[in-house]
């Protein structure tokens, strides 16, 4: 138990490498995914992708590498997600002269890409999982944004039909208190020496009580089921909104009570400034949405929300989109 999500992903980085040392691996290669994000501390930023956010780092760990993400708008990736993974990992191993069974220690995956709620095709993740088993490589899911019911399942990785070795959790683990977790088998979690994987305020009584209360609410109040059931209504309404504004709103991504609206015009131009305007107008009208700084707006209503309140919020969103598009035209 730790205090921040970035501590948890760094913990997983250390655990994967310690397991590699135990297994006699030659190098501590961690394979991450392009476009993913894992935190703001040094190791977490190097596992993340955005090069512009890493230009302050003087030394880039040569044993943290990346393979391409299978975006749903990438026709090559969608034609054969399994082969897309194979091509990515084979190209990586060829470029850096790697033997996967001797050099690769771990895969780090964000369960979905946070900026756009973009999930992997299940076949991609399943092929990655099989590859990891064949080569004695640990698989870690970064569940900071997807865990604890957000996607209609307890953990987001459950949509893929695989079993990871490690889970990094936060945010929804305590609903606002500074609690992060790394979950896994005792074989892996017990690798570090006692005291080498601690944090000043980790596992303090207040956040542990909050985490327990959070779990009780999730299960006793049926919030995971509510996320799944309300999520159907949520996404149906968002699809109606997408159809209405199809010249500006290209697609809606997400599952459960999680969605991202991707604003790209018919010519393929990202509409980040339109997202700015919509987010601002929504806020003025009492609805908080997340503008990611890109061409997307994220929605993540409380798991305890009522259907009426959710539909009211979506009505505010729809009207705000309409008004901003109208203002842009004028």
Regions found by a protein language model. Give the residues of each.
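Conserved N-terminal phosphate-binding loop of PLP-dependent enzymes in the Aspartate aminotransferase
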Residues: 1-330
């Amino acid at each position: 138990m730790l205090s921040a999500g970035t501590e948890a992903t760094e913990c997983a980085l250390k655990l994967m490498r310690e397991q590699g040392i135990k297994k006699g691996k030659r190098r501590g290669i961690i394979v991450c995914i392009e476009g993913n994000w894992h935190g703001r501390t040094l190791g977490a930023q190097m596992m993340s992708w955005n090069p512009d956010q890493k230009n302050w780092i003087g030394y880039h760990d040569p044993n943290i590498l990346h393979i391409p993400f299978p975006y749903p708008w990438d026709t090559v990736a969608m034609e054969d997600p399994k082969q897309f993974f194979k091509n990515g990992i084979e190209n990586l191993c060829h470029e850096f002269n790697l033997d996967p069974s001797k050099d690769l220690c771990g895969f780090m995956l964000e369960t979905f890409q946070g900026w756009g709620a973009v999930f992997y095709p299940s076949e991609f993740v399943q092929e990655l999982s099989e590859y990891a088993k064949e080569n004695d490589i640990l698989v870690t899911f970064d569940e900071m944004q997807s865990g604890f019911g957000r996607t209609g399942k307890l953990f987001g990785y459950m949509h893929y039909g695989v079993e990871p070795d490690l889970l990094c959790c936060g945010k929804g683990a305590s609903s606002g208190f500074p609690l992060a977790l790394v979950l896994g088998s005792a074989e892996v979690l017990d690798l570090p020496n006692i005291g080498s994987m601690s944090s000043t305020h980790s596992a303090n009584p207040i956040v542990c009580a909050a985490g327990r209360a959070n779990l009780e609410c999730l299960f006793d109040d049926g919030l995971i089921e509510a996320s799944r059931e309300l999520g159907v209504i949520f996404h149906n309404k968002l699809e109606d909104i997408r159809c209405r504004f199809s010249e500006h709103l290209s697609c809606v991504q997400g599952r459960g009570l999680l969605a991202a609206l991707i604003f790209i015009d018919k010519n393929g131009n990202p509409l980040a400034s339109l997202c700015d305007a919509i987010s601002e107008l929504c806020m003025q009208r009492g609805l908080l949405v997340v503008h990611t700084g890109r061409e997307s707006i994220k929605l993540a209503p409380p798991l305890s929300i009522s259907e009426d309140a959710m539909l009211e919020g979506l009505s505010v969103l729809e009207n705000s989109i309409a008004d901003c598009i109208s203002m842009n035209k004028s």
